Amino acid sequence: SIRGLAQYTDEVRERFLNLAISYNINIITGSMPYVKEDGSLYNVGFLCRRDGTYDMYEKVHVTPDEVKSWGLSGGKMVRTFDTDCAKIGVLICYDVEFPELSRIMADQGMQILFVPFLTDTQNGYSRVRVCAQARAIENECFVVIAGSVGNLPRVHNMDIQYAQSGVFTPCDFAFPTDGKRAEATPNTEMILVSDVDLDLLNELHTYGSVRNLRDRRNDLYELKIKKPLQD
């Protein structure tokens, strides 16, 4: 069961942390089950830094099927993370379909948003992809989506998977006209490598042909969070 898999989460995290140290890289893991002290089951992932430190992020919005099949609870953690490369945010799969979360992160200075995801159909994938591209435009940031491919026969909710990982950008003169920095081959296991220039974001914030962050009408509307930003 998914709850049984949670007993391996600490071990998996330590393995990724060791890889981050060994290869001198920062790793944003895929998500995995995690049981908190009160017994509630969550979908979480980890930022494993090359200096040996790590942070955990939680999936805030769980799908109806995740509740029905696995009994997952939604997390309460909405925050950005500092790395030696950039200030980043992480939204797990379905979370990217809620623009409020990424806007809160953008207000905290997020430069790159990472979206690990698992979708079983092209419909589900399209929701994640289209929303991810919208988040890049709205928040004037880079967005990286990384999804699972392959099949696990007879494993409920994991038997079929469809993905095309990619790196998306805002749509303005300094960026690709279609907002696509790099894309993997659809539904194919591969490594996608891409460089991004954070200085372009600073220029966009000030000199962009449109300025989605600066031009908000705060005199008409506002975004507020009711819970603490961290649990």
Region locations from a protein language model:
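Metal-dependent catalytic neighborhoods of phosphoester/phosphodiester hydrolases
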Residues: S1-T9, D38-S40
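Hydrophobic residues at beta-strand termini and immediately following loops
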Residues: Y57, F81, A146, A184, ...
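Recurrent small/Gly-Pro-centered beta-turn motifs in extracellular repeat architectures
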Residues: S31-M32
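Active-site catalytic loop in hydrolytic enzyme cores
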Residues: E14, N18, K36-Q111, T121-A134
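Cysteine/selenocysteine-centered motifs that mediate thiol-based redox chemistry or coordinate metal-sulfur cofactors
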Residues: T83-Q108, L201-D231
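A hydrophobic, small-residue-rich beta->alpha segment in the mid-to-C-terminal subdomain
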Residues: R181-E203
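Conserved hydrophobic/aromatic positions in well-ordered beta-strands
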Residues: F46-C48, G166-F168, L192
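CN hydrolase (nitrilase-like) catalytic-core segments centered on the catalytic cysteine
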Residues: Y8-I28, E97-E189
